[in-house]
Amino acid sequence: MKEKEIQENMNKSIEATQRNFNTIRTGRANASLLDRVSVDYYGAETPIKSLATISTIDSQTISIQPFDISCLQAIEKSISMSDLGITPNNDGKVIRINVPPLTEERRKEFCKLASKYAEEGKVALRNIRRDAVDKEKKDEKDGLISIDESRDNQSEIQKITDKYIALIETKLSEKEKEILKV
């Protein structure tokens, strides 16, 4: 694996981890909160953002305006059944969600969830590293590169991995601060 390819794969893992972090509720209303909620729309699981305009009215309220009014009940049901712990209010045209402030216990649960997502991201990075190191060892065994080149490349791969793991740790720290901020 080339260094550029390794970094591209690791960047994808970082982006996936960030998307997971974005779905964790903080004390503020955020449209990305609903990214993981999908609606059973004509027999197909469809993301809410494909069915409606989602906007934040203020720091505590999210507004969902469906493109097709007939899917209003389905959207409301999907939000109610999600693990977000929020209750939608349907006025017949728009769904409003009041995001209540988080309790201390709920904040700790979300911090644990953020840690879990960070760990999944680190595991993905380590898997990329393992694949790259295995390729280096195979190339060395096949005589395509020298032992010294292989060791240098493996050392470089480890440095890249350490850099990306530190980036995940930084993002986790930022997310935990955001969650714990009252």
UniProtKB/Swiss-Prot annotation:
MF GO annotations: ribosomal large subunit binding
Whether Protein biosynthesis counts among this entry's keywords is yes
Q: Does the keyword Transport apply?
A: no
> Where is it mainly found?
cytoplasm
Q: Which GO terms describe its biological process?
A: translational termination
Keywords attached to this Swiss-Prot or TrEMBL record, sorted alphabetically, are: Cytoplasm, Protein biosynthesis
**What job does the chain carry out?**
Responsible for the release of ribosomes from messenger RNA at the termination of protein biosynthesis. May increase the efficiency of translation by recycling ribosomes from one round of translation to another.
Record-stated family: Belongs to the RRF family.
**The protein, known as:** Ribosome-recycling factor
Species of provenance: Prochlorococcus marinus (strain MIT 9215)
